[in-house]
Amino acid sequence: MDQIRLTHLRQLEAESIHIIREVAAEFSNPVMLYSIGKDSSVMLHLARKAFYPGTLPFPLLHVDTGWKFREMYEFRDRTAKAYGCELLVHQNPEGVAMGINPFVHGSAKHTDIMKTEGLKQALNKYGFDAAFGGARRDEEKSRAKERIYSFRDRFHRWDPKNQRPELWHNYNGQINKGESIRVFPLSNWTEQDIWQYIWLENIDIVPLYLAAERPVLERDGMLMMIDDNRIDLQPGEVIKKRMVRFRTLGCWPLTGAVESNAQTLPEIIEEMLVSTTSERQGRVIDRDQAGSMELKKRQGYF
């Protein structure tokens, strides 16, 4: 790779495509975790480039909590159909039977049962030995220290003190029976890189990333967009229309919007240049307990 002639975005693109191809060649049953967000959209775009003009040699897996934004579900189904991807959707049946609800049971229990346990169930059900994820090192401190090849034991647990060295572009993919890896092709990308690449490559994204007037409720310092009627208003709470957008997407009761007028990709990029906060500041699950994200990853989270 001629690093002198390549822009930094093309270098990142080449690195990610190399990682995706390595995993496809090295593992017998890989899968791409598809959470419908901007990083998943970029990762899917890179995977399609990696195997063009052929189709993806692995399926997409969406671990559904039942609480995503309606626009996310519509985008997911439309994207899978447009690109001819095999889409697997899994919900934790035990969580559904228990009626797990982020309002009633809290973000920690909701995430553990519907996301972490749901993911482990799906990986065991289909026997996947490698799972692509869209996490980036600039998002959060526990992700900053995680390798591109993130090894998980037979219980899908991550041990941050027992990670393999990654020298240059050499990755050690040897695993024992029952073990697996999570692979993060976007590890070295930043939020700014993601948005510039989306603009450069004209990648389709969920409209929630663009500012619009939306019904919003302010609760616990978070701007919560009301997506359906599964919420009980507390005394004094009022739903108002405000110009907001999302920097990150998840379950609608646990994902805060930000006030913004950025309605185009160039406006989002310009907004990011002066932003001083993390994109995940609006994710309740990142701060529902001390060391929240690392604890979740140790237990098998994405």
From Swiss-Prot:
Q: What GO molecular functions are on record for this protein?
A: ATP binding; sulfate adenylyltransferase (ATP) activity
* Bilayer-crossing regions: none
Annotated coiled-coil positions are: none
Keywords in alphabetical order: ATP-binding, Nucleotide-binding, Nucleotidyltransferase, Transferase
> Has keyword Nucleotidyltransferase?
yes
The biological process GO terms on file are: hydrogen sulfide biosynthetic process; sulfate assimilation
Reaction(s) this enzyme catalyzes, per UniProt = sulfate + ATP + H(+) = adenosine 5'-phosphosulfate + diphosphate
Record keywords: Endoplasmic reticulum included? no
What are its E.C. numbers? 2.7.7.4
What CDD domains does this protein map onto?
A: Sulfate_adenylyltransferase_2
Q: In which pathway does it act?
A: Sulfur metabolism; hydrogen sulfide biosynthesis; sulfite from sulfate: step 1/3
> Which family does this protein fall into?
Belongs to the PAPS reductase family. CysD subfamily.
Subunit details: Heterodimer composed of CysD, the smaller subunit, and CysN.
Q: What biological function has been recorded for the protein in this entry?
A: With CysN forms the ATP sulfurylase (ATPS) that catalyzes the adenylation of sulfate producing adenosine 5'-phosphosulfate (APS) and diphosphate, the first enzymatic step in sulfur assimilation pathway. APS synthesis involves the formation of a high-energy phosphoric-sulfuric acid anhydride bond driven by GTP hydrolysis by CysN coupled to ATP hydrolysis by CysD.
Q: Which protein, by its recorded name, is this?
A: Sulfate adenylyltransferase subunit 2
Per the UniProt entry, what species is this protein from, by scientific name? Escherichia coli O157:H7
Q: Which gene produces this protein?
A: cysD
